[in-house]
Amino acid sequence: GDRKSLRVPKKPSRSLRKFLGSAPGVEVTDGKIRRLAKSLIKQEADAWSNVADIHKWVRGNVKFQAMAFRGAKFALEKKVGDCEDMTALFVALCRSSGIPSRTVWIEGHAYPEFYLEDGEGKGYWIPAQVAGPPWFGRMAEYRPILQKTDRLRDPIRRRFVRYVPQTARASGGAPRLSISRTMLTDEKPGAESQ
């Protein structure tokens, strides 16, 4: 279908609402992030064009630099960050505008996806690349996807984290730990998968 006919979900489902709030390093309610998001969204424009403007702004205004993760607020204030910071800023700007979005983790890299619906309410997770090739609406990435979210509850540390911890610690008794990775593929590129 026509990308320009896609729209922001009017009533996001419960499973989508988690992709509208803050997460570690994705400071959706920060005043500067909210003001920038408001300035980038044009009420008369279609959703695809609005998200494309967010994509262009992040790519054009935040310089890539390999560094430890500092988050969306840091990337906006300092205009510098690595793929995780740039992704966090894109995600925060989308979420602040009411557009569900999430971080996709692959080996050695992260990129954002945003969620739009067609006229019949069918939703699509759409990839974008904010650090690296300027892909928008497609992803020619060969590395396997490790995770598609940026707000998980760590049961050991009892707090929210950006991604699944790959380590654990135990005290007293014999530890029993199982970590599994399952490789999933979309049946159709852009199909909703959560």
Predicted segments, located by residue:
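Hydrophobic/aromatic-rich core segments of domains that either
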Residues: 85-166
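Secondary-structure boundary elements
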Residues: 3-78, 162-192
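Active-site nucleophilic cysteine motif
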Residues: 50-54, 79-94
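Membrane-proximal bilayer-interacting regions
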Residues: 108, 192-193
